[in-house]
Amino acid sequence: MYSQQKQQDIINNLHTIRDYIRWSISEMTANNVYFGHGSESIWDEAVHLVLSAINVAHDIDSNMVGSRLLTEEKKIIIDYVYQRACLRKPLPYILKKAWFAGMEFDIDERVIIPRSPIAELIRNEFSPWINDIDDVTSVLDLCTGSGCIGIACSNVFEDANITLVDISDDALAVANHNIKKHQLSDRVRAIKSDLFDNLHGQKFDLIVSNPPYVDKQDLDTMPHEYHYEPKLALEAGDDGLDLAKRIILEADKYMTENGVLIVEVGNSQYALMEMCPDIPFTWLSFADGGDGVLLLTYDELVKYKDAFKKYFQK
Protein backbone atom coordinates (compact mmCIF):
# COMPACT_ATOMS: atom_id res chain seq x y z
CA MET A 1 0.00 0.00 0.00
CA TYR A 2 1.07 3.61 -0.42
CA SER A 3 2.87 5.04 2.60
CA GLN A 4 0.74 6.69 5.26
CA GLN A 5 2.25 10.06 4.36
CA LYS A 6 1.41 9.69 0.67
CA GLN A 7 -2.14 8.60 1.47
CA GLN A 8 -2.62 11.62 3.71
CA ASP A 9 -1.20 13.96 1.07
CA ILE A 10 -3.65 12.57 -1.49
CA ILE A 11 -6.59 12.92 0.91
CA ASN A 12 -5.59 16.49 1.80
CA ASN A 13 -5.10 17.66 -1.77
CA LEU A 14 -7.69 15.78 -3.84
CA HIS A 15 -11.36 16.30 -3.05
CA THR A 16 -13.75 15.65 -5.94
CA ILE A 17 -14.72 12.73 -8.15
CA ARG A 18 -13.00 14.58 -10.99
CA ASP A 19 -9.79 14.88 -8.95
CA TYR A 20 -9.66 11.15 -8.30
CA ILE A 21 -10.42 10.18 -11.89
CA ARG A 22 -7.56 12.41 -13.06
CA TRP A 23 -5.20 11.06 -10.39
CA SER A 24 -6.16 7.47 -11.23
CA ILE A 25 -5.24 8.11 -14.85
CA SER A 26 -1.87 9.56 -13.81
CA GLU A 27 -1.06 6.58 -11.60
CA MET A 28 -2.05 4.02 -14.23
CA THR A 29 -0.07 5.86 -16.89
CA ALA A 30 3.02 5.98 -14.69
CA ASN A 31 2.82 2.23 -14.09
CA ASN A 32 2.12 1.18 -17.70
CA VAL A 33 -1.02 -0.76 -16.86
CA TYR A 34 -2.51 -3.00 -19.53
CA PHE A 35 -6.18 -2.87 -20.53
CA GLY A 36 -7.60 -6.19 -21.68
CA HIS A 37 -10.13 -7.21 -19.07
CA GLY A 38 -13.16 -5.08 -19.85
CA SER A 39 -12.22 -1.42 -20.33
CA GLU A 40 -10.95 -0.27 -23.70
CA SER A 41 -9.21 2.91 -22.56
CA ILE A 42 -7.49 4.41 -19.55
CA TRP A 43 -10.34 6.92 -19.20
CA ASP A 44 -12.99 4.18 -19.09
CA GLU A 45 -10.92 2.25 -16.57
CA ALA A 46 -10.45 5.26 -14.29
CA VAL A 47 -14.13 6.22 -14.37
CA HIS A 48 -15.18 2.62 -13.72
CA LEU A 49 -12.74 2.32 -10.82
CA VAL A 50 -13.68 5.56 -9.08
CA LEU A 51 -17.45 5.32 -9.49
CA SER A 52 -17.49 1.66 -8.47
CA ALA A 53 -15.42 2.44 -5.39
CA ILE A 54 -18.00 4.93 -4.17
CA ASN A 55 -20.98 2.87 -5.36
CA VAL A 56 -22.26 5.45 -7.84
CA ALA A 57 -23.98 4.57 -11.12
CA HIS A 58 -21.79 5.04 -14.18
CA ASP A 59 -24.37 7.18 -15.99
CA ILE A 60 -24.18 10.04 -13.49
CA ASP A 61 -24.81 13.60 -14.60
CA SER A 62 -21.60 15.30 -15.71
CA ASN A 63 -22.16 18.00 -13.09
CA MET A 64 -21.71 15.42 -10.35
CA VAL A 65 -18.02 14.86 -11.10
CA GLY A 66 -17.37 18.02 -9.12
CA SER A 67 -18.95 16.50 -6.00
CA ARG A 68 -16.69 16.33 -2.96
CA LEU A 69 -15.86 12.93 -1.51
CA LEU A 70 -15.91 11.73 2.07
CA THR A 71 -12.60 10.70 3.62
CA GLU A 72 -13.69 7.06 3.75
CA GLU A 73 -14.58 7.16 0.05
CA LYS A 74 -11.17 8.61 -0.74
CA LYS A 75 -9.47 5.78 1.17
CA ILE A 76 -11.33 3.14 -0.82
CA ILE A 77 -10.36 4.78 -4.11
CA ILE A 78 -6.73 5.06 -3.02
CA ASP A 79 -6.69 1.35 -2.16
CA TYR A 80 -8.22 0.42 -5.51
CA VAL A 81 -5.79 2.61 -7.44
CA TYR A 82 -2.84 1.08 -5.62
CA GLN A 83 -4.00 -2.42 -6.51
CA ARG A 84 -4.70 -1.50 -10.13
CA ALA A 85 -1.70 0.73 -10.85
CA CYS A 86 1.06 -0.52 -8.57
CA LEU A 87 0.14 -4.20 -8.28
CA ARG A 88 -1.40 -4.22 -11.77
CA LYS A 89 -4.30 -6.37 -10.63
CA PRO A 90 -7.16 -6.39 -13.18
CA LEU A 91 -10.02 -4.18 -12.08
CA PRO A 92 -12.69 -6.93 -12.12
CA TYR A 93 -10.66 -8.84 -9.52
CA ILE A 94 -10.48 -5.71 -7.36
CA LEU A 95 -14.22 -5.12 -7.64
CA LYS A 96 -15.02 -8.87 -7.45
CA LYS A 97 -17.49 -8.31 -10.28
CA ALA A 98 -17.59 -8.42 -14.07
CA TRP A 99 -20.23 -7.75 -16.70
CA PHE A 100 -20.90 -10.14 -19.56
CA ALA A 101 -23.70 -9.96 -22.15
CA GLY A 102 -25.49 -7.40 -20.00
CA MET A 103 -25.37 -9.50 -16.83
CA GLU A 104 -23.35 -9.02 -13.65
CA PHE A 105 -21.22 -11.91 -12.41
CA ASP A 106 -19.37 -12.33 -9.14
CA ILE A 107 -15.79 -13.39 -9.79
CA ASP A 108 -12.37 -13.69 -8.17
CA GLU A 109 -8.97 -15.13 -9.00
CA ARG A 110 -10.37 -18.67 -9.10
CA VAL A 111 -11.76 -18.00 -12.58
CA ILE A 112 -10.77 -16.17 -15.73
CA ILE A 113 -12.30 -12.72 -16.18
CA PRO A 114 -15.29 -12.81 -18.60
CA ARG A 115 -14.43 -11.00 -21.84
CA SER A 116 -15.28 -13.33 -24.72
CA PRO A 117 -16.68 -11.85 -27.96
CA ILE A 118 -19.24 -14.63 -27.70
CA ALA A 119 -21.16 -12.12 -25.54
CA GLU A 120 -22.14 -10.28 -28.73
CA LEU A 121 -23.37 -13.51 -30.27
CA ILE A 122 -25.53 -14.12 -27.20
CA ARG A 123 -26.95 -10.59 -27.27
CA ASN A 124 -27.86 -11.15 -30.94
CA GLU A 125 -29.59 -14.43 -30.03
CA PHE A 126 -27.11 -16.38 -32.18
CA SER A 127 -28.55 -14.89 -35.36
CA PRO A 128 -28.23 -15.90 -38.16
CA TRP A 129 -26.77 -19.24 -37.08
CA ILE A 130 -29.79 -20.45 -35.12
CA ASN A 131 -33.05 -19.81 -36.96
CA ASP A 132 -35.53 -20.56 -34.18
CA ILE A 133 -34.34 -20.18 -30.59
CA ASP A 134 -37.36 -22.18 -29.43
CA ASP A 135 -35.84 -25.25 -31.11
CA VAL A 136 -32.91 -25.14 -28.67
CA THR A 137 -33.85 -27.15 -25.58
CA SER A 138 -30.38 -28.10 -24.33
CA VAL A 139 -27.18 -26.05 -24.13
CA LEU A 140 -23.70 -27.07 -23.00
CA ASP A 141 -21.08 -24.56 -21.84
CA LEU A 142 -17.71 -26.34 -21.82
CA CYS A 143 -14.87 -24.90 -19.71
CA THR A 144 -17.42 -22.66 -18.04
CA GLY A 145 -15.23 -20.82 -15.52
CA SER A 146 -17.53 -18.29 -13.83
CA GLY A 147 -20.51 -19.73 -15.71
CA CYS A 148 -20.98 -16.51 -17.66
CA ILE A 149 -21.56 -17.98 -21.14
CA GLY A 150 -24.04 -20.65 -20.11
CA ILE A 151 -25.88 -18.41 -17.67
CA ALA A 152 -26.13 -15.62 -20.26
CA CYS A 153 -27.52 -18.18 -22.72
CA SER A 154 -30.39 -18.73 -20.30
CA ASN A 155 -31.71 -15.29 -21.28
CA VAL A 156 -31.88 -16.34 -24.93
CA PHE A 157 -33.09 -19.92 -24.58
CA GLU A 158 -35.65 -19.39 -21.86
CA ASP A 159 -36.99 -22.95 -21.87
CA ALA A 160 -33.68 -24.76 -22.34
CA ASN A 161 -31.83 -26.84 -19.80
CA ILE A 162 -28.26 -25.64 -19.55
CA THR A 163 -25.23 -27.61 -18.40
CA LEU A 164 -22.01 -25.93 -17.28
CA VAL A 165 -18.85 -28.05 -17.25
CA ASP A 166 -15.42 -27.43 -15.80
CA ILE A 167 -12.58 -29.56 -14.48
CA SER A 168 -11.74 -27.05 -11.73
CA ASP A 169 -13.48 -27.35 -8.36
CA ASP A 170 -12.71 -23.68 -7.74
CA ALA A 171 -14.35 -22.63 -10.99
CA LEU A 172 -17.40 -24.77 -10.27
CA ALA A 173 -17.80 -23.11 -6.88
CA VAL A 174 -17.90 -19.70 -8.58
CA ALA A 175 -20.23 -20.95 -11.32
CA ASN A 176 -22.64 -22.42 -8.76
CA HIS A 177 -22.60 -19.14 -6.86
CA ASN A 178 -23.56 -17.27 -10.04
CA ILE A 179 -26.31 -19.77 -10.84
CA LYS A 180 -27.85 -19.00 -7.45
CA LYS A 181 -27.20 -15.27 -7.86
CA HIS A 182 -29.34 -15.27 -11.00
CA GLN A 183 -31.92 -17.68 -9.53
CA LEU A 184 -31.43 -20.29 -12.23
CA SER A 185 -30.98 -23.46 -10.17
CA ASP A 186 -34.13 -24.96 -11.70
CA ARG A 187 -32.62 -25.25 -15.19
CA VAL A 188 -28.90 -24.52 -15.02
CA ARG A 189 -26.54 -27.02 -13.42
CA ALA A 190 -22.76 -27.17 -13.08
CA ILE A 191 -20.90 -30.48 -13.09
CA LYS A 192 -17.27 -31.49 -12.84
CA SER A 193 -15.94 -33.11 -15.97
CA ASP A 194 -12.86 -33.22 -18.14
CA LEU A 195 -14.68 -31.88 -21.19
CA PHE A 196 -17.25 -34.55 -22.18
CA ASP A 197 -16.05 -37.36 -19.91
CA ASN A 198 -18.89 -37.21 -17.36
CA LEU A 199 -21.74 -36.36 -19.72
CA HIS A 200 -22.52 -40.02 -20.47
CA GLY A 201 -24.05 -39.73 -23.90
CA GLN A 202 -26.20 -36.64 -23.33
CA LYS A 203 -27.14 -34.71 -26.47
CA PHE A 204 -27.15 -30.93 -26.87
CA ASP A 205 -28.63 -28.60 -29.47
CA LEU A 206 -25.91 -26.04 -28.82
CA ILE A 207 -22.39 -26.44 -27.45
CA VAL A 208 -20.46 -23.27 -26.69
CA SER A 209 -16.92 -23.24 -25.36
CA ASN A 210 -14.27 -20.70 -24.48
CA PRO A 211 -11.54 -23.18 -23.53
CA PRO A 212 -7.92 -22.38 -22.67
CA TYR A 213 -6.22 -21.44 -25.95
CA VAL A 214 -2.99 -19.60 -25.10
CA ASP A 215 0.15 -21.24 -26.42
CA LYS A 216 3.20 -21.54 -24.20
CA GLN A 217 5.17 -18.79 -25.93
CA ASP A 218 2.34 -16.27 -25.66
CA LEU A 219 1.70 -17.19 -22.02
CA ASP A 220 5.29 -16.38 -21.09
CA THR A 221 5.11 -12.93 -22.69
CA MET A 222 1.61 -11.83 -21.65
CA PRO A 223 1.21 -8.59 -19.64
CA HIS A 224 1.44 -8.90 -15.88
CA GLU A 225 -2.34 -8.51 -15.45
CA TYR A 226 -2.99 -11.90 -17.07
CA HIS A 227 -0.85 -13.71 -14.52
CA TYR A 228 -3.50 -13.06 -11.87
CA GLU A 229 -5.76 -15.44 -13.79
CA PRO A 230 -5.60 -19.20 -13.20
CA LYS A 231 -3.03 -20.77 -15.50
CA LEU A 232 -5.38 -23.73 -15.99
CA ALA A 233 -7.85 -21.37 -17.70
CA LEU A 234 -5.27 -20.01 -20.16
CA GLU A 235 -2.58 -22.50 -21.15
CA ALA A 236 -3.28 -25.03 -23.90
CA GLY A 237 0.00 -26.53 -25.07
CA ASP A 238 2.56 -25.52 -27.65
CA ASP A 239 -0.01 -24.46 -30.26
CA GLY A 240 -2.80 -23.35 -27.93
CA LEU A 241 -5.12 -26.02 -29.30
CA ASP A 242 -4.86 -28.93 -26.86
CA LEU A 243 -8.46 -28.61 -25.68
CA ALA A 244 -9.98 -27.24 -28.87
CA LYS A 245 -8.79 -30.29 -30.82
CA ARG A 246 -10.37 -32.65 -28.28
CA ILE A 247 -13.63 -30.71 -28.38
CA ILE A 248 -13.79 -30.78 -32.19
CA LEU A 249 -13.06 -34.51 -32.32
CA GLU A 250 -15.58 -35.52 -29.67
CA ALA A 251 -18.41 -33.00 -29.96
CA ASP A 252 -20.56 -34.79 -32.55
CA LYS A 253 -21.21 -37.65 -30.11
CA TYR A 254 -22.88 -35.17 -27.76
CA MET A 255 -24.90 -33.18 -30.29
CA THR A 256 -28.35 -33.51 -31.77
CA GLU A 257 -28.51 -33.86 -35.55
CA ASN A 258 -29.30 -30.15 -35.94
CA GLY A 259 -26.71 -29.18 -33.35
CA VAL A 260 -24.20 -26.34 -33.55
CA LEU A 261 -20.73 -26.13 -31.99
CA ILE A 262 -19.12 -22.76 -31.25
CA VAL A 263 -15.54 -22.65 -29.95
CA GLU A 264 -13.31 -19.69 -29.22
CA VAL A 265 -9.64 -20.28 -30.04
CA GLY A 266 -8.36 -16.69 -30.16
CA ASN A 267 -5.01 -16.18 -31.84
CA SER A 268 -4.67 -19.95 -32.19
CA GLN A 269 -7.09 -19.58 -35.12
CA TYR A 270 -4.11 -19.29 -37.45
CA ALA A 271 -2.44 -22.42 -36.13
CA LEU A 272 -5.72 -24.31 -36.58
CA MET A 273 -6.20 -23.06 -40.14
CA GLU A 274 -2.65 -24.02 -41.04
CA MET A 275 -3.12 -27.42 -39.43
CA CYS A 276 -6.40 -28.08 -41.29
CA PRO A 277 -6.02 -26.40 -44.70
CA ASP A 278 -8.93 -28.23 -46.33
CA ILE A 279 -11.53 -27.64 -43.62
CA PRO A 280 -14.01 -24.83 -44.44
CA PHE A 281 -14.32 -23.43 -40.92
CA THR A 282 -16.92 -20.73 -40.38
CA TRP A 283 -15.17 -17.90 -38.53
CA LEU A 284 -17.59 -15.52 -36.86
CA SER A 285 -17.20 -11.74 -37.10
CA PHE A 286 -18.10 -9.27 -34.36
CA ALA A 287 -19.13 -5.63 -34.61
CA ASP A 288 -17.72 -4.98 -31.14
CA GLY A 289 -14.33 -6.48 -31.99
CA GLY A 290 -12.81 -9.87 -31.39
CA ASP A 291 -12.07 -12.86 -33.57
CA GLY A 292 -10.95 -16.47 -33.40
CA VAL A 293 -14.42 -17.94 -32.83
CA LEU A 294 -15.36 -20.87 -35.05
CA LEU A 295 -18.68 -22.52 -35.81
CA LEU A 296 -19.21 -26.09 -36.97
CA THR A 297 -22.51 -27.89 -37.44
CA TYR A 298 -23.14 -31.48 -36.47
CA ASP A 299 -23.13 -32.44 -40.15
CA GLU A 300 -19.75 -30.77 -40.69
CA LEU A 301 -18.23 -32.46 -37.65
CA VAL A 302 -19.35 -35.85 -38.95
CA LYS A 303 -18.29 -35.10 -42.54
CA TYR A 304 -14.78 -33.98 -41.61
CA LYS A 305 -14.19 -36.27 -38.64
CA ASP A 306 -11.63 -38.45 -40.41
CA ALA A 307 -9.84 -35.37 -41.74
CA PHE A 308 -9.69 -33.88 -38.25
CA LYS A 309 -8.24 -37.11 -36.90
CA LYS A 310 -5.58 -37.08 -39.60
CA TYR A 311 -4.65 -33.43 -39.10
CA PHE A 312 -4.66 -33.55 -35.30
CA GLN A 313 -2.47 -36.66 -35.13
CA LYS A 314 0.37 -35.10 -37.11
Curated annotation (Swiss-Prot):
Keywords: Methyltransferase, S-adenosyl-L-methionine, Transferase. It is an enzyme of class 2 (transferase). GO terms for biological process: methylation. The keyword DNA-binding does not apply. Its EC number is 2.1.1.298. It catalyses: L-glutaminyl-[ribosomal protein uL3] + S-adenosyl-L-methionine = N(5)-methyl-L-glutaminyl-[ribosomal protein uL3] + S-adenosyl-L-homocysteine + H(+). GO terms for molecular function: nucleic acid binding; protein-glutamine N-methyltransferase activity. Gene3D superfamilies: Vaccinia Virus protein VP39. The keyword Transferase applies. GO terms for cellular component: cytosol. InterPro entries: DNA_methylase_N6_adenine_CS (IPR002052), HemK-like (IPR004556), Ribosome_uL3_MTase (IPR017127), SAM-dependent_MTases_sf (IPR029063), Small_mtfrase_dom (IPR007848). It comes from the Bacteria. Belongs to the protein N5-glutamine methyltransferase family. PrmB subfamily. HAMAP family: L3_methyltr_PrmB. Methylates large ribosomal subunit protein uL3 on a specific glutamine residue. This is Ribosomal protein uL3 glutamine methyltransferase. It comes from Francisella tularensis subsp. tularensis (strain SCHU S4 / Schu 4). The gene is prmB.
